[in-house]
Amino acid sequence: MKKTIKNSTHRPEDILVHAIKKRRSASGDVKNAVKLKEGEDYLRVEEEIPHDDNVVVIDDGCDHDHDVDDNDDDEEENGRYCRREFDHGYHLVKGQMGHGMEDFIVADTKTVKGHNLGLYAIFDGHSGSDVADYLQNHLFDNILSQPDFWRNPKKAIKRAYKSTDDYILQNVVGPRGGSTAVTAIVIDGKKIVVANVGDSRAILCRESDVVKQITVDHEPDKERDLVKSKGGFVSQKPGNVPRVDGQLAMTRAFGDGGLKEHISVIPNIEIAEIHDDTKFLILASDGLWKVMSNDEVWDQIKKRGNAEEAAKMLIDKALARGSKDDISCVVVSFLQWID
């Protein structure tokens, strides 16, 4: 079953998408994944994310164990476990770059092994939307289905990214077409596991004015050695940004089969604690970060209590500063502790 929701417009060339409350089935299945299809002027809401049973699981290396299944270590008061409530909102705008909408997001919750999970992601496609579309529908399922996710999330996420990319290259796109990814899994409002490839970014903001970027911008001028070690090169034309083999403005991405030998899909991963004064987790595509710094983003929304309003305010500010690209933003707000 599918639903469509008509959207109001900020101006004719924009597509604005406001926050939608998610539903969760008794079994914990993800419901109502947000999908804005290329060429459409409306939001299509899918009832359920399909699971891909054809992804081949491979082992691409080892990481030290970092157990995130820590129910036994939760803070206790009077013998009861304490957890942190959290909520989310999001906003998307189609840019003015002469192509269809290529940004896709996930903003959802589900329960797994007794944990309340927040699943948040930005997928910023390039040379088409097919890869970003596929990632929105499959990547979280592939991550959470890894048998060692709770015991060794870094190893599990790297394996899921790699196996998903292998499937994409074989079945979804040819030599052109790819996507960034920033995925964040919030666990009981206490801990967050963040992974990324490309230049979509995530930051954590605390009321003490501490703003921490928890992703890495995979830009060619910062990873020249990586590209060179794979047999590629980084070049820059006057007035343009550095590019891998003169083509791609990032060193890590899903897809991009024609450049795969010279780029990587292995993500940077960080596991962070949510502090008592942590207020927001913010994920956004580079349409926002090109015109606003991390500190400017925090300054704009620090007084906001509503995540949806915060996400819309940030995109409105980016538009006012002249951003022409697709812009997507997910804001997670951390609320009171509960037991």
Swiss-Prot record:
Cofactor or coenzyme needed: Mg(2+); Mn(2+)
Enzyme Commission number(s): 3.1.3.16
Enzyme class: hydrolase
Gene3D superfamilies xref list: PPM-type phosphatase domain (3.60.40.10)
Residues given in the record as Mn(2+) 1 binding sites: 124-125
One Pfam short name: PP2C
One MF term in the entry's GO annotations: metal ion binding
Coiled-coil stretches noted in the UniProt entry, renumbered to this chain: none
Swiss-Prot/TrEMBL catalytic activity: O-phospho-L-seryl-[protein] + H2O = L-seryl-[protein] + phosphate; O-phospho-L-threonyl-[protein] + H2O = L-threonyl-[protein] + phosphate
Source taxon at top rank: Eukaryota
PPM-type phosphatase domain mapped to chain residues: 87-334
Matches recorded under InterPro entries: PP2C, PPM-type-like_dom_sf, PPM-type_phosphatase-like_dom
Keywords: Hydrolase, Magnesium, Manganese, Metal-binding, Protein phosphatase
Cofactor annotation remark: Binds 2 magnesium or manganese ions per subunit.
Binding residues for Mn(2+) 2: 124, 286, 325
Family under the similarity heading: Belongs to the PP2C family.
UniProt name for this protein: Probable protein phosphatase 2C 28
Organism: Arabidopsis thaliana
